[in-house]
Amino acid sequence: MACKPVMDGVLWNLGASSFPTEEQNYTDSAEKWRKDFDDMKHIGIKKFMLFTGVPQGMTRKAAAAPDIIEFIISECDRCKMDFIIATGGHPNWFLDWKMPDEMKLVRSYVDEIHRRYADHPSFAGWYIDYEFSLRYNDRQYLRDLYRETVILCKEKTPGLPVITSPFFNPPTSTDIMQCGIHEPQEYYEYWSDMLAYSKPDILALQDTGGQHLSFFEKDTTEPYIAAYAKACAENNCRFWGNVETGEFHVGSAEEFTEKYGKDGHVSEHPEIWRPVPIDRLQRKLEVMSKYSEANMSWGYQPFYRPSMNAAAATAYRDYEKYLAVNFPEMLVD
């Protein structure tokens, strides 16, 4: 394996998401937040990445602190975690294709983030806040959008990495959510070109696709993971995993179509989401870790924020037991 089948980093929402509630970020006390960080440190989390909701986090007061991001990065300092932050962007960037306006907005966010937080010792990089898999009609726009964002970040903080986290859509018997059906070779060719042109430092691949469905297993996902890893290896880009710990619980593509329609969307049914069962999470980590040098986990939070609810507390304990049995060196007292 390229790395241990464990999570050593988390991606955290400050804005709306399909699974966790954003409100807890703003209503929890400083004491509860510190306990969250201690819980993450205990299970070996070394990287903390903020993505959705960064502009909101810079302006909305929270119970823990007037500036919740300042509080979070200070906790990263305390816990010796690397802090990585999204560049921000227009909420409807995928609908409103205006490069000058978009880059003006991103530059304003990057400038403000740098002014407020870059002096912290944990400040360790940037996350490109544009997630997609394959978009052929908008391909040149996206190539330029990525390239200009990477250049902007590297001008602001030379030497710090810029990270992106695309996804893939595994084939299903019906075209769920109109994601399209594409072979691994298409992803390899598309992202080889994207990486060569835009030059991000790290690609952290989401491991269960834009559909986030619970029935995807190794035989479906691994060819896509291998294709992205190959594109990274050939384009001087480090390959990380983004192993998702929440999923939309459904048994098959046919069941999804019958219940929600082919054009239904998983974000419309938050009640169906669940923490990934621990045996399935282990399989997901093992597949990704054959290729990745490190594994993040996208921002559902149940396996690393036990304060969220009872299901999250159970998931956290399950993962803690997994580490105790298989990788006890990851646990920190």
Regions found by a protein language model. Name each.
Residues P5-G9, N25-Q56, E75, D193-A204, ...:
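Catalytic domains of carbohydrate-active enzymes, especially glycoside hydrolases
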Residues V10-K32, L95-M103, D175-P184, F256-R280:
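Active-site mouth loops of central-metabolism enzymes
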Residues T27-N92, D138-I163, F215-E234, T314-A315, ...:
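Aromatic-lined substrate-binding rim segments of carbohydrate-active enzymes
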Residues A65-C79, W97-G125, L145, L152, ...:
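An active-site-proximal structural segment forming one wall of the substrate-binding cleft
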Residues F48-M49, P200-S214, A231-D333:
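Substrate-binding cleft of secreted/luminal carbohydrate-active enzymes
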Residues C3-N25, K35-I43, T221, I225, ...:
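Ligand-binding pocket scaffold of soluble enzyme catalytic domains
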